[in-house]
């Protein structure tokens, strides 16, 4: 759960000072909204028996879960809140794509719709015994469910809302890099809960996931910083922080199944891939993805998912594939799971944004955008002179 304040600080520091509180408010309130929806029906639709795409309402309001009920070796209430944290951070990641121009009410409407019709079915398909799980997809801690899912939704939102006023003409620099660093550090700490905790036991897989997360993140920081140094002539703190996030994202689907050497390679590749995503791909897409959600979470999530299919091989130090599965087959399954997630999330996001637009409108008026969302949407200023 520390990832929630972490992402609020990380994104907040990347924005202009007139919009930092709007970002933090969007993250905090969407977190609360998703928590409530998770208890009402989210956990049930994701993790109860159902069909290939959705669970059922059998555990709505946690019906049938007793104080002593178990999920694996843990009490089931722990599983409920642990998985709630994944749902909350996934929705929080999305809002960075269209920051500084969206209506607060539109964020909440979108979040409720997208959570229900994209996050929950993807989580069920991958982790709840659904379609992709039956196909053999490997996603240890959320490459598809969290990162690709969120990144595609954010990209759709960035396109539909359009570019910020003055984009390409004015300098949009991060207003507080120490805040970005603090957010990165908190995210880094919280990520160990995601990755090691996804082993669902204090065992050798949790230890492997913990170590792999450290190694991959270190590799990604180095590859991003040195690549940036070569391209721009100077290494930057923002590059180091972005490399850290890129490494965390890339190792997420692989943390508990690849060896340490594989984790290092995934991190090194993820760092360079993330830099490519925010420098070149962003220009090719001609999109104003404010906090580079797709460039980091989308690109590195895809890279991590594909390389999971490679480095899970026992011959490369991983835990090995299911009986009879070859590397080529597993990579194909991974690519298919990526494709399903991209299409599903993209379609749901498009519809959800359109509905929010019809109900309240997506974008604030230009004069409010130029003055800042903090004062116009929330009646506050982050920095009072």
Model-derived features: where do they sit?
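Glycine- and aromatic-enriched membrane alpha-helices
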Residues: 1-385
